[in-house]
Amino acid sequence: MSQSLISFSNLDNWLFVAPALLLAVLSGYLSERVGIVNIAINGGMVFGGMFLSLMSYAFVPNANDSAPSWSLAISIPLSVIFASAVGFLFGIAAIKLKADHVIVGTGVNLLGTGINFFVAQNARSLLNDTDLRVRYSFVRTGNSVSIEGIAIFAFAIIFVLLVWYLMNFTKTGLRYRAVGENPNVIDTQGISVYKYQWFGVMASTMVAALAGCCFALSPQVPSFSSGDVSGFGFIAIAIMIISMWRIIPSIVISPLFALAYVLTTGVVGNANNTYLLRTIPFIISLLVMMVFGYLNVGPKNVGKHFDKGLR
C-alpha cells in the first residue's frame, strides 16, 4: 500500500492534476466575479482536453509515435482558442438572451460530452486510430518526474498569482469585481457592464479549457475517448465556495484536493474498493461545504441579469 501511495508516479500525476484543478477554480472565479454563474467548467475542460488530443495527431508522423513535447507550445494555445467558441455560445445565451445561467451551463456540459463521444466513436475514420488518445509521452527516467509536469505546475501557480494581483491591485480588476457586486453603480459611471461580463465569460471558458489540457496530459489519462475529467469542473465550484471566492485560499486548497484525488486513484486494490476510494475527495468537499458553506457569501449579483432600468 505504501509503495502505491508514495511514489514518483503519483507525484508526476499530481504535477498535472493540481494545476488542472487550480485553473478550474480560477475559471469559476472569473465568471462569478462578473455575476455569471458558470457550471459549464466541466464542459470547458472536456473541450480543452478533446482539442488537445486532436491537436496531438497533427505532430505525429507515424501511427505508433508520440507527439514531441515542444509541440505543446502550439497545441495548448490553439486548443484554448478553439474551445473559446463554446464561451461565445454561452455568452450569447446567458448575457445577450438572458437565459438561466445554470440551464445554459448544463447544456454546455452535455454538448462537450456528446461531441467528444462522437469524435471518439469515429476515431478510426477521422483519425485513423482505434481511440481518441492523448499522443504525448514525456520522458521519465528512474526516480524522477517529467520536466513538463514541473513547468506546467509552475506556470499555473504564476498565472493564478498574476490574476490575483490584477484583480486586487489594478483599477480594471477592482471594476471587474464590482460588476459582480453592484453592476448598476458601475453602469452609472459610464463603464460597460456587458463588456466586463463578456470578457469574464470568455476568459472563464479559456481558463477551463486550459485546465482540461492539463488534466488530459496527466500520465493517468492515456485516452480521452470518454471525455471524463473526473468531475473536476464541479469540485472546482465547491473549492471556490470553500475559498470564499478568493484566489489565495484556492492556491492552497486545490493542490490538497488534487493530492487526495491522486492518492485515492493510485491505491492498488480490487475494483470495488478503488471506485469507492475515488469518491473520497468529493465526499470531503461536500462535508467541508456543509460545515463552512453557510459562512461564505459570494458576489451579491451573481446569477442575476443586468438591468439598466434599475439605476
Curated annotation (Swiss-Prot):
Organism: Mycoplasma pneumoniae (strain ATCC 29342 / M129 / Subtype 1) (Mycoplasmoides pneumoniae)
Membrane topology: Multi-pass membrane protein
The protein, known as: Uncharacterized protein MG121 homolog
Subcellular location: Cell membrane
The keyword Transmembrane appears for this protein: yes
Superkingdom of source: Bacteria
One Pfam family it belongs to: BPD_transp_2
GO CC field: plasma membrane
UniProt-listed InterPro entries: ABC_transp_permease
GO MF term set: transmembrane transporter activity
PANTHER family, A to Z: GUANOSINE ABC TRANSPORTER PERMEASE PROTEIN NUPQ, SUGAR ABC TRANSPORTER INTEGRAL MEMBRANE PROTEIN-RELATED
Keyword entries, A-Z: Cell membrane, Membrane, Transmembrane, Transmembrane helix
Transmembrane annotation, as ranges: 11-31, 34-54, 72-92, 101-121, 147-167, 198-218, 233-253, 257-277, 279-299
